[in-house]
A protein has these predicted regions:
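Extreme N-terminal, non-catalytic leader segments
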Residues: 1-18, 41
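ATP-binding Walker
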Residues: 27
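Residue-level preference for the first positions of well-ordered beta-strands
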Residues: 16-20, 108-110
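ATP-dependent NMP and nucleoside kinases share a basic, alpha-helical "lid"
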Residues: 70-80, 94-150, 168
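N-terminal phosphate/diphosphate-binding loop that engages ATP/GTP or pyrophosphate donors
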Residues: 31-80
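NTP-dependent small-molecule kinase module
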Residues: 2-6, 151-152, 166-218
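Hydrophobic/aromatic beta-strand patches that form the interior of the parallel beta-sheet core
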Residues: 46, 65, 130-132, 176-178
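P-loop (Walker A) phosphate-binding loop of NTP-binding proteins
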Residues: 22-24
Length: 218
């Protein structure tokens, strides 16, 4: 038997997990998410639907699915979202169908949602969910990062700082906490969490058959 055949024979099916990364705006969540997706082919980004205007450089269907309020409200009424919320007067939501398909195929889904979205996901999918909150190294550093965003005016920065304070008060509702002082270290920590969570017994859907195949009783 070749090495490839041995590797195939040792494959144990698993159910994918839902990995939530949350942080206040400017804490580095997007950078960490991008690196994780580049490093790991077994995880894909959940594409949320939003009613906010498209920003320069964004691609419809990749960064977000952009929709008008009427379409969004109809999907809410039809219970087609895993979670949805209103942020800065715009609606955001995660469609159910593509997420469930990915999990059933044994792949993981990365979510970029706030604490409200995380609570809703936890309510309906606790066994599938792993949540991580990313904190900035300091409030001063967070404000500096926000001011560095050309598209955000001073009044917008003030609003985001106020919201950041509120968001950070929910840090203790998450499974894991990472202080993002160094991006590479933060990415490595997320990868370590992901590796361990994938090995949890509850997610090893093919483990029972594997063990029985060795003549071990349940």
């Amino acid at each position: 038997m070749s090495n490839d055949e041995k590797s195939s024979a040792m494959t144990i099916s698993r159910r994918g997990l839902m990995l939530v990364l949350s942080s206040p705006s400017g804490a580095g969540k997007s950078t960490v998410s991008k690196a994780l997706l580049e490093h790991d082919a077994q995880i894909i980004m959940s594409v949320s639907m939003t009613t906010r205007p498209m920003r320069p450089g964004e691609v419809d269907g990749k960064d977000y699915v952009f929709a008008d309020q009427g379409i969004f409200d109809a999907m809410v009424k039809a219970n087609e979202f895993l979670e949805h919320a209103t942020v800065f007067e715009n609606s955001y939501g995660t469609p159910k169908a593509p997420v469930e398909k990915t999990l059933s195929e044994g792949r993981d889904v990365l979510f970029d949602v706030d604490w409200q979205g995380t609570q809703e996901l936890e309510r309906i999918a606790r066994d599938d969910l792993v949540s991580i909150f990313i904190l900035p190294p300091s409030v001063e550093e967070l404000e500096r990062r926000l001011h560095g965003r050309v598209q955000d005016a001073d009044d917008v920065v003030k609003k985001r700082m106020a919201k950041a304070t509120s968001e950070m008060s929910h840090w203790n509702e998450y499974d894991y906490i990472i202080v993002n002082e160094n991006v590479d270290e933060s990415v490595a920590r997320v990868e370590a969490i992901l590796a361990a969570e994938r090995l949890k017994r509850i997610r090893q859907s093919g483990m029972l058959d594997f063990v029985r195949g060795m003549g071990v009783s349940q």
